[in-house]
Regions:
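Terminal domain-initiation and capping elements
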Residues: 1-107
């Protein structure tokens, strides 16, 4: 398995673990979305909480130039350590949602 395939497998495993969790209130569903062809991965939430519609992403990750770009991380403790613990080196993880990484990857 090459680096990209390995990273894809780890990202999907981590997102699937979070997708099994259930929010403590409301009728909210979590749905993983995987696009291996373009190396994009997301965990979406949708449903209702106290007559208010809930929708949006909790996690959005992409792989570019052999690096894992965490584009959005709405998980309380973050997913970085989960990715590292499952084998992705810290040096290959970019916290793309931070201003200092705006120019990384040309995005």
């Amino acid at each position: 398995m090459d680096t990209i395939e390995s990273y894809q497998a780890v990202i999907k495993q981590v997102i699937n673990e979070y997708a099994k969790l259930r929010p403590s209130h409301g009728n909210i569903h979590l749905e993983p979305i995987f696009d291996d062809e373009n190396s994009r991965y997301a965990l979406m939430q949708f449903g209702w909480d106290r007559e208010r519609r809930v929708r949006g992403n909790l996690i959005y990750v992409s792989i570019k130039n052999n690096k894992v770009f965490i584009e959005y991380d709405g998980i309380e403790n973050g997913i970085t350590q989960d990715l590292v613990q499952k084998g992705i080196p810290e040096r290959d993880i970019v916290l793309a949602f931070l201003p200092e990484f705006q120019a990384v990857g040309g995005q």
